[in-house]
Amino acid sequence: FSKENSISIAINSILDKIYKLDDESFNNQTLIKFYESVKRRSEDIVTSQGRSALINELYERFFSKAFPLTTSKLGIVYTPIEIVDFINHSTNEILKDEFNVKLEDKNVHILDPFTGTGTFIARLLQTEIIRKENITYKYKNELHANEIVLLAYYIAGINIESTYQDIIKPNNYEKF
């Protein structure tokens, strides 16, 4: 996945440059500590669910520290995974009870209008609300996400694509 996605390629290129810096030329202790913390935490993550949680936490922390006014204006907040799962499952139940359809059914389009880092869609794929045999059709045709914050938009793309790739494990890359 990371070799095919253009955003992932760009981010990895930047990270490679950071890795090559030696400690003498990199004297910002706060950034070094943050980077080392991220590196330590990410080394043990092997699932897309774990990556999603780390991405969300880092994104919110980064924005709240680097751009507090933007965070406040745009309402950038991390929604805990448990709340995301509750909302996704509740929506599916309401659709079944009130409209006799499920989120996985054909012609039921799913729109996340303020997707942030793509957690709602990633979790929708991970929690099997959409069964594996229906995921490819839904992914290619009926999942939609919008975001006005460019960094979040790129992260959402990576998050959703990597989640899909982990579930389907195809030999070829599928862009979201």
Language-model segments: which ranges?
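Long recognition/docking surfaces used for binding and targeting
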Residues: F1-F67
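SAM-dependent methyltransferase catalytic region
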Residues: R41-S42, V46, G50-R51, E57, ...
